[in-house]
Amino acid sequence: MESKACESKNEDLLPSGITSKGGSSSPFFVTSTHGTIIENTSSTGTLTQMPFFPKYEVELDSPRKSTPYPGKEHIERVLEEYSHQVKDLQRRLNESNELHEKQKFYLRQSVIDLQTKLQEMQMERDAMADIRRRESQSQEESRNQLQNTVRELEAAKCLKEDMLKDSSTQIEQLRKMMLSHEGVLQEIRSILVDFEEASGKKICEHDSMSTMHFRSLGSAISKILRELDTEISFLKGRIFPVEDQLETLKSESQNKIELLLQQHQDRIEQLISEHEVEITGLTEKASSARSQANSVQSQLEIIQEQARNQNSMYMRQLSDLESTVSQLRSELRESKRMYEDKIEELEKQLVLANSELTEARTERDQFSQESGNLDDQLQKLLADLHKREKELSLEKEQNKRLWDRDTGNSITIDHLRRELDDRNMEVQRLEALLKAMKSECQGQMERQMAAIQGKNESLEKVSSLTAQLESTKEMLRKVVEELTAKKMNLESSERTVSDLTASLQEKERAIEATNAEITKLRSRVDLKLQELQHLKNEGDHLRNVQTECEALKLQMAEKDKVIEILRQQIENMTQLVGQHGRTAGAMQVEKAQLEKEINDRKLELQEFKILKDKKDAKIRELEARVSDLELEKVKLVNAGSERLRAVKDIRHERDQLLNEVKTSRTELNHLSEDYEVLKRNFRNKSEEMESTTNRLKMQLKSAQSELEQTRNTLKTMEGSDGHAMKVAMGMQKQITAKRGQIDALQSKVQFLEEAVTSANKERHFLKEEKSKLSQELSTVATEKNKMAGELEVLRSQERRLKEKVANMEVALDKFAECQDIIQRQEQESVRLKLQHTLDVKELQGPGYTSNSSVKPRLLQPASVTRSHSNIPSSQSTTSFLSHHSIKTNTPKEDPTRDLKQLLQELRTVINEEPAMALSKTEEDGRTPSLGALEDRVRDCITESSLRAELCHRSNNSLRESTEGSKSSETLSREPVPLHPGDLEDPSSCFTFTSTASPSGKMSASRSFSSSPKKSPVHSLLTSSAEESVNSTPQYRSTKPIHSPTSAKDSQSPSLETTGKTCQKLQNRLESLQTLVEDLQLKNQAMSSMIRNQEKRIQKVKDQEKMLLK
């Protein structure tokens, strides 16, 4: 019962003495404290140098209470003091550990806070850099877009100018073509008139050819062709009997040819017989070649037997050769290199032999018709070569096997060496263990010399250890025996390797001998091939002789045929002379008819040439149109390529996103693998710690058993009174020894406990990391799902963009068509303008006469010029005959605004065209659109400024008209080409309005206003450039010579036609303007959609970057 109580007390003291509340994780600190306590067991003054008594000392003192002996109370007091000091030390240690842990916790929190702040600052810096980069990219993109638009507008202007120039050239070509067609038709009519005069027949019964219309020429030509066909059929009827005569002559010539062929066959048979005699001689030569081949075969068999004998000798000599492993390796490497080179040479020789054999085969096939017996010999040679190749392949396989064996032996040698090294390391480790065990045994023997019973136990332990030593010695002996056996195996393997190298060398020699024999055989084969070539040459010579004979025979036959044909021709000529004398008159008539047919056919050819020229002109026009369409196609392709580039960029971004997703997946896989590795390491560590704890527990149990034995011995020793002090002293010595052991065990236990706590912390940390990784996996999975959804959205958007791109391409095609229509309409309007101005000039030509007596009564303005600050007032008073080269630079705007301006200018020009009337009657016939235009112009300009300018101009014009009446000049009617620059500014177009006097009898006076630019009408009404530069500008006020009724009758139809065309053009232009506006709206919608998509893509990219960060 007392022992149990002591044990319970000691167990209560253990946790207080060993473990602390805080539990510091540093084993170094614990060991240092233990060192200080053990060293200073005698001093009791300071706290840090007090002795440390474990529970075993208390348990040893517990049985002493029952048996009093001198010095017992002193020991108990000392023990109590020691226990109080230990408790105080434990409290202070716990407090210091708690303070240390708090400081660590605060430091960790501060470090974490600083890291978070650093991350936030880095995020902000990256965001600012991204924003700046995006702004710079957006600015560069906007600049590039503006530059592209400017370039496209310049290209469009250049294309319009080129189109106008091409249209003017095409118009001139068409005029020339019309003139040439008219000349051709006149020539056809003259040819038909000549045909009527020559034949005396009338093609048309009612009308003559000179008065016939061009449309009826086709029917007349068809009649002539029908008549010619009837005449040709009549001539063909006469040709048939002549063909019958020719057939009879052909049959006779065929009979003669058959006779000649029979003679030729007889000669060929003779030549064949001679050729067979020559073939028999060649067969004899072939038989001799076969005998030589048999002799070669026998020699090859002898060589094979020699090679076998040599191989047997080599196998016998393999057991006698020995060498070291290092020499073996070097020799093997060198032999391998040499052998590979030789094998390559042999393979090359085999390839050459195969190529030569294939050539021999082809030559044999060609010569098989003449010498078929040589095939057997060549086949035998080929069989021999195949046998040699098989033997070489077998030798190669044997060499490979030997090499594999050598490599295997070298590998086994390396493994054995490694095992030897491992065993040596184990032996060294066992020796170190033996030394450690010996040292431990010696220490135990020295400690237990005082105790008699302890000596017996130590002897038992020594005996067990000696048994273990003997067992380890036996293991070492076995290992040494195994090593010796392995060394023997290594030596035997080295010998076999040396034998194999010797055999390889011998085989190489045999291969060299076989190669020499093969070269000899090749030389013989070459000789045989030379003989075959000689025979072939002889055969070719015979064939050439045969071909020459056949050619001579054919020449003879042809000459015979020619002689017979000449004879037949002479006979036929004699017969035909009489017939030709009869049919000479008929032939002359036919000749005349044929000449007529030839002339007709010539005319048809000329017509066909004319049609061909027309088609060529059409083809040229179509080619010009095709070139224009190609230019437009290039523009559309460029636009489409830009759109495709944008789509490709989007795809590239999508691929980048997919690559990033893949990288994230790979990172997750790597993290999962690292997590598994950490799990495995933790399991291994936990198992090791468990094993160490089990060992320490076993040691504690053994120590406890030893303590129980010492207690029993103490109980037995208490009976003896005289020897009590001696036993006590001995026991104290034993106790001091045991205390050292117990202290060591306690330090180990504390170290293990600290390791367990650290392992638990690591386990907790790993659990936290696992939870973090699981959270990160969940977040990555959610992000992956989001990215998949966003990718699907992007794909749908790409599909929509593709559809929109297709729609935009269709719209661009329509826009190009609209541009074509606008250009055509402009060309038509310009053409109508030119026609109208030409008609007006023709009507005005005789009416312009200089008259200085007549003065205008009323002056009204018709058009207002744009005032320019740089132009002086003297230039504003010049008349419509002066030429000005000043042009204003219009700013570059959008293509839609340019189109609108062009449309407005065309409307003004079309509305101003009817204002070119010269009399009151022409004013009465104007359309209401002219009055509206005049009202607008008059409302826009103040009357005072206009009257002053007009008065000044009228005075100047009257002075100049008086001077210019002496030298009147004629107006030039040369048309001036219209440039697109003349239509850009509406103020550049001149308008001419005439107002009647109140009485209606006086002629209308005219006021002309000049502008910095020339209008097309102005350029048409003015004289040539040289006259305009040399002569002074004059203003002419004239009276019309013709009556008003005649003027009205002559100009009313032209005004009506121009009015109708102008209305049509206005309607078309309005429809085109609406189309252009619709297209502009669609383009704006598309641009807005594209911008929105770009913004979404940028948002997605920003989100991805944030997630990655």
UniProtKB/Swiss-Prot annotation:
Superkingdom of source: Eukaryota
Amino acid composition bias (Low complexity), ranges on this chain: 999-1019
Region (Disordered): 1-31, 843-897, 952-1061
Biased composition (Basic and acidic residues): 1-12
Biased composition (Polar residues): 17-31, 862-882, 953-970, 988-998, 1020-1037, 1043-1061
Key words of the record: Coiled coil
Organism: Mus musculus
Matches recorded under InterPro entries: CCDC158 (IPR031809)
Protein name, entry field: Coiled-coil domain-containing protein 158
Listed Gene3D superfamilies: 1.20.5.340
Keyword Coiled coil annotated: yes
Keyword Repeat: no
Coiled coil region boundaries: 71-166, 242-828, 1053-1109
